[in-house]
Amino acid sequence: VRSSRSRIPESLDQVASVVEKLAVLLAAGVAPTAAWTYLANSPSDVNDTVTAVAKRVESGTNIADTILHRMDDAAERARGDDWQANGRRLSRRRAAPTTAAANEAAWRGLAAAWFVAIEAGAPLAPALREFSSSLRALAQARRAALTALSGPVATAKLVVVLPVVGILFGVALGFDTVGTLVATLPGLVCLVTGLVLLWAARVWNRRMVRAATPTDLTPGLVFDLLAVAVSGGASIDKAKSTVATAFERSGCAVDSDGVVEVDGVFDLSQRAGVPAATLLRSEADRIRREASSAAERKAATLAVALMLPLGLCVLPAFMLLGVAPLMLSVLSSTVGGL
């Protein structure tokens, strides 16, 4: 059974490319249903999601609902794949959002944007073009965050194996460090304590990495969708209700702080006589920039914070599992030779 990664594009840039090409086709006068069909038959854009959506919309199914149905199916199959693979679905759900999760959020965002454009009477092509630009900015921010995290994550994985290296080093020197660990009382104490410290270090590292990984998969999306709604001529109240419905239908996460800021943007627009759509898109860009900067700051902080489990857990475990058995073996051989 294929994993969910094969069912949706592998990067946000690919999702953005699909959205941008849809915008170009629609701007050229191609009907929405035909646009999806053309993309599904294009070798450069073939993927399971586009193909599945194209097949369903040909029968007259609502496009936004079709995208959401496809995402629900992919998520359900992914859950089944995870259970069949190793039964660790629960731990994966608690982990930080993966690239596949970010891509799924992008597709759900597309469904929400499509729904808002249709309901608000906004032209689909400009709305999708703006959304594709938002996805590319989001992809860039996510790449920057993951790049900043790569160093600390590699460090966290590397330091955990240091105690094992210590044990192998003792064996290479000709000492029975393994026998000392499992066959003597002091060795067993060192073994149990060292393993507990290693387990604590691994849990600690994973929690810190998870806390430093961006969790908002679609920052600024609420402002993007409101910009689409008001650009179609919808009133402020109508735009808010339409976007709220779109979020509820699509399952996208709503940032409560962003919802509060929306009123300030509309108030500024009315007082200054500036188009609300322009201000909303500007606010969405600002939120994405801040999210990217925050992710980079967390990654930089993580590089320092990882020294805590290294000093408090890994190094003591290294002493208990690598150095202490070696010393015990030396003492044992020395005493035995007297």
Model regions: which residues?
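Juxtamembrane/interface alpha-helical elements of multi-pass membrane proteins
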Residues: 1-75, 79-95, 190-253, 259-268, ...
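Conserved G/P- and acidic residue-centered "switch" motifs that form tight phosphate/ATP-binding loops
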Residues: 29, 121, 273
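Bilayer-spanning, highly hydrophobic alpha-helical transmembrane segments
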Residues: 144-202, 296-338
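C-terminal soluble domains/tails of integral membrane proteins
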Residues: 238-296, 301, 308, 314-332, ...
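Membrane-interface, cytosolic juxtamembrane amphipathic helix immediately N-terminal to a transmembrane helix
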Residues: 83-105, 112-160, 277-313
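Short cytosolic helices in intracellular loops of multi-pass membrane proteins
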Residues: 108-112, 222-225
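Membrane-spanning helices that line or support transport/gating and their immediate boundary helices
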Residues: 130, 203, 207, 211, ...
